[in-house]
A protein has these predicted regions:
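TM-loop-TM module centered on a large, flexible mid-protein loop between adjacent transmembrane helices
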Residues: 73-76, 80, 111-113, 219-289, ...
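Membrane-interface "cap" regions at the ends of multi-pass membrane proteins
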Residues: 1-40, 51-56, 68, 176, ...
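Helix-loop-helix junctions that connect adjacent transmembrane segments
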Residues: 3, 40-41, 116-117, 146-275
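Hydrophobic transmembrane alpha-helices that form the core helical bundles
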Residues: 31-34, 53-126, 130-134, 279-299, ...
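C-terminal membrane-solvent junction of multi-pass transporters and transport-like membrane proteins
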Residues: 9, 310-318, 353-402, 440
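Transmembrane helix-loop boundary segments of multi-pass membrane transporters
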Residues: 30-41, 104-119, 138-148, 273-280, ...
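Select transmembrane alpha-helical segments in multipass membrane proteins
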Residues: 7-17, 80-93, 121-125, 179-192, ...
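Membrane-interface loop-to-helix entry segments
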Residues: 107, 118-168, 179-180, 220-225, ...
């Protein structure tokens, strides 16, 4: 059972990478402003370096071994099946619940801009997105890229509108002076990473990409550069025009910047357009998260970590059972507080980064002659630096609430139990065959 190659090129890969992340540029990042603008800016540059280096490393691995399992495949190659499985389940859980959180944010934007939302809208969004993915990767990718382009245009509109109103004085308040402190940077990191997180999950498309040795690296590098430029401009112009106090606690910081009392005139129409753009951005991220999560679980089942039936594909080459499982998890996640979900995603994915970067270093060491159509710039040095940054991100997440940490721990226990159950059910028929009289 294999996935179809469907004419997916580097532009689709770049679109997938941007779409996976773009919602984080509309919401979530601004909570880091509570640590002060300078500390948030430094935290953003640190996680940008992490994201770029990580993208180079996983692009090398994906080009060498295109696989729908993405990160877990490389961890399995380096450290064995159990480690690979746990990384795969960690990534799957983060992406699946992130799909539900994206539905929650879309509902919130829709209620604010259009006047309706709630659970029925979340349910409809999840059903439509899973339905489109069931039609095959080609149609899903085209819609995903279109939604991503619309959301990027919305951000450009925000920046063009706010840039003339920029004032350095708006970047600070008496309570939040323009001072730099290690603790302030550390506190801002879990929020700064929302400007880039999950871009590395584009490797899930490598099995369906034409010429992955060329298109995966080119697409991933393009995605990170687009996101970096966008993130820095948002941090400078949105905060510098709307004011740090006004944006720090807003659920919709770009919309809040356009309606800030600090602006010399009203931009109500532009704010409405940007609100709609934010919905498209979240929709693009929701598409991307559902895509990557379904491929992750499909690959785990196909490799025998989970029951084989989960790796079934429909007549259009889409993994239908994994998509429906992602949809079910997303429905339940959409009922949870979104910030708790988002912070659980950061903790889980940063843990997977640590393992995959260690896997990159190990594979460079023990398999130096493995064919590598693309080689990461800086090699093991880049991976080691990113490994240190990943540990920093992971440690920063432990300033968060106990309930979220307990939930992540419970999920890991479930993942181990699921693998043990799968191994027992697959071993039982084999044992039964050995005990039949005909085989004695």
């Amino acid at each position: 059972m294999t996935l179809q190659r469907s004419g997916v090129g580097w532009k689709h890969v770049a679109g997938l990478g941007v779409s996976l992340v773009i919602a984080g540029q509309f919401t979530g990042w601004n909570y880091g402003l509570a640590s002060g603008w300078a500390n948030m800016a430094i935290a953003t540059l640190l996680v940008a370096l992490l994201s770029f280096g990580l993208a180079l490393c996983v692009a090398e691995l994906a080009a060498a071994r295109p696989h729908a399992g993405g990160l877990y495949t490389y961890c399995q190659d380096a450290f064995g099946r159990f480690t690979g499985y746990m990384v795969g389940m960690t990534v799957f859980g983060a992406l699946a619940i992130g799909t539900g959180a994206a539905a929650t944010f879309i509902s919130a934007y829709c209620e604010h801009v259009l006047g309706f939302g709630g659970f029925p809208l979340k349910l409809a969004l999840i059903a439509v997105i899973i339905g489109v993915h069931l039609r095959g990767v080609g149609e899903a990718m085209n819609l995903l890229v279109a939604a991503g382009v619309i959301s990027v245009l919305a951000i450009i509109l925000v920046l063009a509108t706010l840039a003339p109103h920029f004032s350095p004085a708006n970047l600070l308040t008496p309570e939040l002076p323009l001072e730099i402190s290690p603790l302030g940077v550390f506190s801002a990191i879990p929020f700064a990473i929302w400007l880039f997180i999950t871009v590395e999950q584009t490797t899930a498309a490598s099995e369906e990409v034409d010429d992955p040795g060329k298109n995966i690296p080119r697409g991933m590098i393009a995605a990170v550069m687009i996101l970096l430029v966008s993130a820095l401009c948002i941090l400078l112009f949105a905060v510098g025009a709307g004011g740090i106090t006004h944006l720090a606690a807003a659920d919709d910081p770009l919309y809040a910047a356009l309606t800030s009392p600090l602006l010399s005139k009203s931009y109500a129409t532009v704010a409405t357009i940007v609100g709609l753009g934010g919905m498209f951005g979240l929709l693009a991220t929701m598409f991307s998260l559902a895509y990557s999560a379904s491929r992750q679980l499909y690959a785990l089942a196909r490799e025998g970590h989970l029951p084989k039936v989960i790796s079934r594909v429909n007549r259009l080459g889409a993994p239908d059972l994994t998509l429906m499982l992602v949809g079910g998890i997303a429905v339940f996640a959409s009922l949870a507080p979104p910030m708790s979900i988002l912070l659980a995603v950061v903790l889980s994915l940063s843990a997977s980064y640590i393992v995959v970067l260690a896997a990159f270093i190990r594979l460079r060491t023990v398999e130096p002659d493995m064919p590598r159509p693309f080689r990461a710039w800086g090699g093991r040095g880049t991976a080691a630096a990113c490994l240190v940054l990943s540990v920093l991100v992971f440690a920063a997440c432990f300033q968060l609430d106990i309930a979220m940490l307990a939930g992540v721990g419970a999920y890991f226990i479930f993942a181990i139990a699921a693998r043990l159950f799968s191994r027992r059910t697959e071993a039982a028929p084999a044992a039964a065959v050995k005990e039949t009289p005909a085989n004695v």
